[in-house]
Amino acid sequence: MSLLPVMVIFGLSFPPIFFELLLSLALFFLLRRLLQPTGIYDFVWHPALFNTALYCCLFYLITCLFV
């Protein structure tokens, strides 16, 4: 069970994972914006794959915090 309740907004029911996805997406955009000036993407073979893996790792960490 998740610590977050099911949210009902304007008659639409949102499961707790929806808010975890939004939080991890916001953290991903922030972290990506911080990593771009450092030049780490010059060492990455496939930037899109790196971004996907980064988002998945952030989502996993956020989900572990709320479970």
From Swiss-Prot:
InterPro entries given in the database record: DUF1656 (IPR012451)
Keywords on record: Cell membrane, Membrane, Transmembrane, Transmembrane helix
Pfam families linked to this entry: DUF1656
Highest taxon listed in the record's lineage: Bacteria
Membrane-spanning parts: 3-23, 47-67
Compartments reported by the entry: Cell membrane
The name this protein goes by in its record: Protein AaeX
Gene that encodes the chain: aaeX
